[in-house]
Amino acid sequence: MTTTKRLKFENLRIQFSNAIVGNFLRLPHSIINVLESTNYAIQEFGIAVHSHNSDIPIVHLGWDGHDSGSSENVVLINPVLATVYDLNQKSPLVDLYIQRYDHTHLATEVYVTPETSDDWEIIDANAMRFQNGEILHQTRIVTPGETLICYLEGIVTKFKIDRVEPSMKSARITDGSLVVVAPKVNKTRLVKAEYGHSNKTILKNGAIQLLKKVILRSTVCKMDFPKDNLFVVYISDGAQLPSQKGYASIVKCSLRQSKKSDSDNKSVGIPSKKIGVFIKCDSQIPENHIALSSHLWDAFFTHPMNGAKIKLEFLQMNQANIISGRNATVNIKYFGKDVPTKSGDQYSKLLGGSLLTNNLILPTEQIIIEIKKGESEQQLCNLNEISNESVQWKVTQMGKEEVKDIIERHLPKHYHVKETGEVSRTSKDEDDFITVNSIKKEMVNYLTSPIIATPAIILDGKQGIGKTRLLKELINEVEKDHHIFVKYADCETLHETSNLDKTQKLIMEWCSFCYWYGPSLIVLDNVEALFGKPQANDGDPSNNGQWDNASKLLNFFINQVTKIFNKDNKRIRVLFSGKQKTQINPLLFDKHFVSETWSLRAPDKHARAKLLEYFFSKNQIMKLNRDLQFSDLSLETEGFSPLDLEIFTEKIFYDLQLERDCDNVVTRELFSKSLSAFTPSALRGVKLTKETNIKWGDIGALANAKDVLLETLEWPTKYEPIFVNCPLRLRSGILLYGYPGCGKTLLASAVAQQCGLNFISVKGPEILNKFIGASEQNIRELFERAQSVKPCILFFDEFDSIAPKRGHDSTGVTDRVVNQLLTQMDGAEGLDGVYILAATSRPDLIDSALLRPGRLDKSVICNIPTESERLDILQAIVNSKDKDTGQKKFALEKNADLKLIAEKTAGFSGADLQGLCYNAYLKSVHRWLSAADQSEVVPGNDNIEYFSINEHGRREENRLRLKTLLQQDVVHETKTSTSAASELTAVVTINDLLEACQETKPSISTSELVKLRGIYDRFQKDRNGEMPNGENSIDIGSRLSLM
């Protein structure tokens, strides 16, 4: 059955059934069999009910899919619906015409009007249930001019169908259709406002006739409005102007649930007031748009915004005699707490060139404008074409009760009255924006594209990285340059998100706003607070319920946005912002709601210089010394986020205030002092090493390895202007391999100190985890940590234990680690500022894929030192200095010949030579201690000879006192000699070194040396780079791998 053909069934009787809820029929079994044979869905059938042998339909209904259960010629209908169309069980027979309504007969929008004001109040009281689709569930076929019924909480409401979009005689609605209800208010129940809100066009002096009415979309443009004309609007330059004067009013959003109060019973959908305006044209205004002056927005009690529906009514040109301000009296009623701040002459200058409207309230000026001509009020007063002398200006102070009434009944919530009586409007934060990231342009281009795959995108980045600041910059641009309405919400500040009904109501309000004011953009900052990722609840049922609510809310949000998006691709866009993409509910991605993801990283040095200059400029007291530049400071603040830079700038300011005689000039010393005491957020909790206490000169030999490390790690940072223009990808990975104890780990530790890079050391147990996915997560977090503190060296010691060849692990853990390493080291993002340094003694055990270009680009051997290299190592050991005192750690006699020791230590590694020196040092210590034990000690002496004059019997007492004094002198002398001995240093002689050389043996045996030499030779020459074929070995004793 095609859409143009109809099935006709005659001579059917009508019966009532309360089981039918809505605008449906139930058909007899004979008709159902015919419809089921067509293989079309029951939702696609529409039924036209005709009187028998009549061509005029009574009503168009849908089929609810049930059998009437009666005789073959009976159809069932809801009794209330039957009453509407005067159908009863005693009515004559009816005929049914059944037609298929396919996708070409779908209505996107249906405009209806309640039959009575009671119906409207029922809808208003049950707006949530109505908006959640009650009418869509109870209706399938809509026809202009017919009546619908809808059950809300058991109460029946009736609607008249005004029109459908796209226009057609009869159409089918689905879950994606929008039903727009025009309010119908009982006028006798309205409380008439004393001031303003007048929609009449009939005056006592005569009638103001309207030429034309248009509804335009408001836009916030960067325009210079005339200062002498407060109430002016600009429309598109291509529009024809029937008149240069007219009324402007805002059409309230009819999709939003009205909020009634005792002081304001106005209904949504009715213009709040009409204000007389001058109408001008400008080429900056897009077609079908209108720009309003700031005073006009203020008179509407509304923030300047995009998307508001502005009703513009043009006045006839020959009405000048009616709206003339000649001989008029303008009474300015001041409702501030204090006396009026301006005189009549000042108000004359402020309002003199405008078109004034009677009883107009200007909240920020705290005045009400009243216009009279003689004894009667005048609705409009044109002061632009007459002199101020022909107008009488009066300023009066309103009483306290009148002021209180105005504030309670007329001023919206975003206006507040201060204790001084001043009325102000809470406005948006208008910061001075500074663009430091290029991804804003990419995001704006994507969001403003006419066609995109899905409506949502995600911006992620760590806390303090600048997401909210970037969002504000983006919102400012799309509002000013692209005329898009933006609804911004910080999900962390939302209350009662655990209450499903209240949050659904809030989401419905967002979507209603965006549909009405569209094209629009919903920006949800910190989205993980509202749509977080479900986590393991460990048996806690309450936690499970909370996550279940979060998923329900997200599903509800996706469905609401998708409905609008499917109707009009340009109507709505969504931008999510969160700390990590993995913390957001995966339902967003499972339903393919998000199409693109942008990640915000720490600013580079140019952006940091720009930010530092911006934060310094905000603090007008500080200034840099002449020898400092912001580009120099940016090099010292690698890894700082914008928030870190802002806090750091404040710290510099406070440190500056503690200095005396500084003239508020930031010097190099002050900056370094503040920097050393500040830790950026990216480094908090990170095991980071920047001072390894191992200097380049502490390592002997290994000249080739040192050169390669400096070329790879130091040069790109030191000579950045040269390397930044390199057309090829720079080397970022080095493998140090060689015999045990030959300085691989020592080199890695010293290179960070030499090149001034951050250093993160990684050990196998910190990464490997038996649980699937845990090891990979550790690798990802490790690289993210290194990226946040770049330039950084990521050092993997004993790399063969972390990334062995795949297919030889019984648990499969290291296989997954290798796969993740391959992705991170040579992924699409690359490693900008992160260098990989790996050390191993068995390079043959490392997976060959990691040794290819783009990963570990260069392999450097740390070989067994030759005689000259051993001499170099010995000299480095004995010449090493203490970091704190600057003195040599190793005291060697002056005439010692280290070349002799180098000749006798063939086959020794660097670690062996260091151990030999330590053994020699111990021998010198033993020799020094033996010499110290033989030091002189002053003996005691009991035979003391002395003489005394006039002792008078006190001889023995004096002898004992003298003995005590002498013993104290002996103790002091012993202590002094011991203190002097402690300052001596054990000196290592050549004999100590020779004895230690005889006692020390190489740590690498001859057989092990031969084995390793063969491995390294094959690694250097015969390595073919072949990977395992993935097949398990079938040899006896081989292990299986969990792949």
Swiss-Prot record:
Catalytic reaction annotation: ATP + H2O = ADP + phosphate + H(+)
Outcome, altering H495A: Cells are able to grow on a medium with oleate as a sole carbon source
Topology versus the membrane: Peripheral membrane protein
SUPFAM superfamilies on file: Cdc48 domain 2-like, P-loop containing nucleoside triphosphate hydrolases
Outcome of swapping D525Q: In PEX1pB1; no effect
Stored SMART domains: AAA (SM00382)
Main location: cytoplasm
Induction of its expression: By oleate.
Effect noted on mutating F771A: Cells are unable to grow on a medium with oleate as a sole carbon source
Cellular component aspect of the GO annotation: ATPase complex; cytosol; peroxisomal membrane; peroxisome; transporter complex
Molecular-function GO term, any one: protein transporter activity
Region annotated AAA-cassette D1, chain positions: 453-626
Keywords for the protein's UniProt record, in alphabetical order: ATP-binding, Cytoplasm, Hydrolase, Membrane, Nucleotide-binding, Peroxisome, Peroxisome biogenesis, Protein transport, Repeat, Transport
Localization (cell): Cytoplasm, Cytosol; Peroxisome membrane
GO biological process: protein import into peroxisome matrix; protein import into peroxisome matrix, receptor recycling; protein unfolding
Protein family: Belongs to the AAA ATPase family.
Domains as described in the record: AAA-cassette D1 is required for interaction with PEX6. ATP-binding in AAA-cassette D2 is required for interaction with PEX6. ATP-binding and hydrolysis in AAA-cassette D2 is required for proper function in PEX5 dislocation.
SUBUNIT field: Interacts with PEX6; forming the PEX1-PEX6 AAA ATPase complex, which is composed of a heterohexamer formed by a trimer of PEX1-PEX6 dimers. The PEX1-PEX6 heterooligomers associate with the peroxisomal importomer via interaction of PEX6 with the peroxisomal membrane anchor PEX15.
Function according to Swiss-Prot or TrEMBL: Component of the PEX1-PEX6 AAA ATPase complex, a protein dislocase complex that mediates the ATP-dependent extraction of the PEX5 receptor from peroxisomal membranes, an essential step for PEX5 recycling. Specifically recognizes PEX5 monoubiquitinated at 'Cys-6', and pulls it out of the peroxisome lumen through the PEX2-PEX10-PEX12 retrotranslocation channel. Extraction by the PEX1-PEX6 AAA ATPase complex is accompanied by unfolding of the TPR repeats and release of bound cargo from PEX5.
Name the UniProt record assigns to this protein: Peroxisomal ATPase PEX1
Lineage of source species: Eukaryota, Fungi, Dikarya, Ascomycota, Saccharomycotina
